[in-house]
């Protein structure tokens, strides 16, 4: 799981950093190269969770090909479709919705409050623990199950897995009946941002990393983050009994991440041979 640097937003002060390119295609290219290497080392049944946000073209940008000033660039989908051409299976586009987004001064469009999380895999068969991230069903759904479905209506046949009123009201005749209180995780996740007292001001919330890791990585599995930042993914991975490998260009963030992960795991050897 990873979240690469935003495009044309921040300067991390490092040579060969990603995010300060002069054109969207020049930003996408290095990311694709990184993720092709990730694909090479990923298990055949592994998953890749990619968090990326879009941005708008500005007059201060130079050499932007095909982007007019004030135009939404479409970077997430440009990257996702390019990765699909490289052989990745694009399995899901998850919307990370934030109720506490960064305020914006624009008065001629809605304010942004979401980012994309793409689920990509190496094949059509892969590890995905749907029960680990299942959601409780809504109260209204439980009530509908209680009353079942009426006869002689367009809903008489119900939906797969739905029980009839007779099954619920007469369990002795129809056999044991149980209502599953959980439903499959949906693709809009409402998770607020959480401030972190550290040097990295673009850290995503631990709950976001937790959901992806629980669903896509088995216990004792390895989580790889090629853009480690302040170590949110690493801290969550260690807390969930997963192994972790983090890669970071900025030494300051590396030290911050090491300290953060050590607090969770208590392992003093963390950071030895840090990439």
Describe the residue ranges of each PLM region.
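Core catalytic lobe of class I
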Residues: 1-266, 274
């Amino acid at each position: 799981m990873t979240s690469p640097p935003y495009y044309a937003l921040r300067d991390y002060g490092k040579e060969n950093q990603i995010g300060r390119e002069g054109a969207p295609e020049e930003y996408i290219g290095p990311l694709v190269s990184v993720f092709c290497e990730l694909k090479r080392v990923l298990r055949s049944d592994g998953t890749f969770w990619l968090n990326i946000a879009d941005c708008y073209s500005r007059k201060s940008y130079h050499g932007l090909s095909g982007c007019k000033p004030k135009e939404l660039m479409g970077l997430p989908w440009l990257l996702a479709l390019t990765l699909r051409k490289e052989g990745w299976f694009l399995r899901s586009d998850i919307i990370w919705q934030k109720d506490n987004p960064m305020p914006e001064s624009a008065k001629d469009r809605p304010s942004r409050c979401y980012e994309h999380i793409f689920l990509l895999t190496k094949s059509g068969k892969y590890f995905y623990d749907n029960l680990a991230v299942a959601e409780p069903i809504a109260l209204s759904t439980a009530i509908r199950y209680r009353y079942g479905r009426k006869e002689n209506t367009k809903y008489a046949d119900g939906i797969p897995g739905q029980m009839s009123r007779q099954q619920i009201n007469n369990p002795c005749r129809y056999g044991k009946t149980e209502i599953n209180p959980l439903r499959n995780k949906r693709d809009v996740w409402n998770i607020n941002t959480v401030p972190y007292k550290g040097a990295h001001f673009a850290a995503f919330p631990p709950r976001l990393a937790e959901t992806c890791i629980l669903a896509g990585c088995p216990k004792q599995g390895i989580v790889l983050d090629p853009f480690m930042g302040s170590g949110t993914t690493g801290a969550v991975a260690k807390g969930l009994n997963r192994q972790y490998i983090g890669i970071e260009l900025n030494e300051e963030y590396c030290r911050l991440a090491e300290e953060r992960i050590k607090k969770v795991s208590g392992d003093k050897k963390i950071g030895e041979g840090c990439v």
